[in-house]
A protein has these predicted regions:
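Amphipathic alpha-helical transducer elements in NTP-driven molecular machines
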Residues: 38, 65-68, 72, 96, ...
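Switch/connector loops and helix/strand junctions flanking conserved nucleotide-binding motifs
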Residues: 36-42, 50-53, 124-127, 161-166, ...
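Phosphate-binding/switch region of NTP-binding enzymes
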Residues: 7-11, 142-249
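Phosphate-binding/switch loop-helix module in NTP-utilizing enzymes
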Residues: 83-146
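Cytosolic-facing regulatory segments adjacent to core modules
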Residues: 9-111, 236
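Flexible beta-alpha connector loops of hexameric P-loop NTPases
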Residues: 56-63, 84, 124-134, 166-175
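Internal alpha/beta scaffold segment
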Residues: 1-5
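Generic beta-strand/beta-sheet core signal
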Residues: 31-33, 86-88, 118-119, 155-156, ...
Length: 249
């Protein structure tokens, strides 16, 4: 499970899975409930072309010929990526039916890896209370990850607790915690790994946490839960989100 800036990070993962595993057969199913699929493709173009999405989408100026040729070239490459998008919010049961259909149609009986990405959990069509909906969604994902060679990457939001003045002004409370994740109990228990991506700079924090880490142009990845390897840890990235990218420090 991943929380913010979630969509850019997950979008990068989806294409990297394909780019970095050229000898593997992969099927990627993305529930893009927060953003329509073509916007996700736009972010991929931004990352690969080193152009901001505002530049690519702008109606004020035309793209120069070289950039336009690159857009066409990369777009043709992306058409070959084994990635499918679901744009419309679904109930947990509807999501389960879609996952089962894709598994039976494209994966079952093959040696393909099946990757399910869900962005994001709180946009699921409700079947009752938020807690009831999240519990049912987690049941779906626990069942889905039992398919052979299947991984589930679900995205969620942080709540507003981390933005409180008490947290911002106390360096011992800067780091994300389990309770900062919306619907934390259901999502945390169902996940093998829980990762929080945090930009303390946008909260006005200049020195981050008890180690007084620099925040300028930094993004920190906190692994709060690691079922196989134990202790939590923090990874540091350079902020390259203008191009929908993160650079490992």
């Amino acid at each position: 499970m991943i929380t913010k800036p979630k969509s850019s990070f997950a979008n990068e993962i989806s294409t990297d899975i394909v780019d970095l595993n050229p000898d593997e057969e992969i099927v990627i199913l993305i529930f893009s409930l927060e953003m329509v699929g073509f916007r996700q493709v736009g972010r991929t173009l931004s990352s690969k072309l080193r152009k901001t999405t505002s530049t690519l989408y702008s109606s004020e100026t035309d793209l120069d010929d070289d950039t336009f040729r690159k857009v066409i070239s990369v777009s043709n490459q992306l058409k070959e990526y084994p990635i499918w998008f679901v744009d419309n919010p679904t109930t947990p049961k509807e999501a389960e039916d879609i996952i089962r259909y894709f598994y039976n149609t494209y994966v079952k009986g093959t040696n393909k890896h099946f990757v399910i990405m869900y962005d994001h959990a709180l946009l699921t069509k409700p079947i009752g209370s938020v807690i009831e909906t999240m519990q049912e969604l987690e049941r779906v994902f626990i069942s889905a990850k039992k398919y052979p060679m299947t991984s589930v990457l679900q995205l969620a939001q942080m709540n507003r607790n981390i933005e409180s003045p008490e947290r911002i002004n106390n360096f011992l409370s800067h780091y994300p915690m389990r309770s900062d994740i919306s619907s934390a109990d259901a999502l945390f228990q169902a996940s093998d790994y829980v990762i929080v991506i945090h930009r303390p700079e946008i909260l006005g924090i200049q020195e981050y946490g008890p180690s007084h880490l620099s925040t300028q142009n930094k993004v920190y990845l906190h692994i709060l839960k690691n079922r196989d390897a134990g202790k939590p840890c923090i990874l540091e990235f350079q902020n390259d989100l203008a191009y929908n990218n993160l650079i490992e420090s």
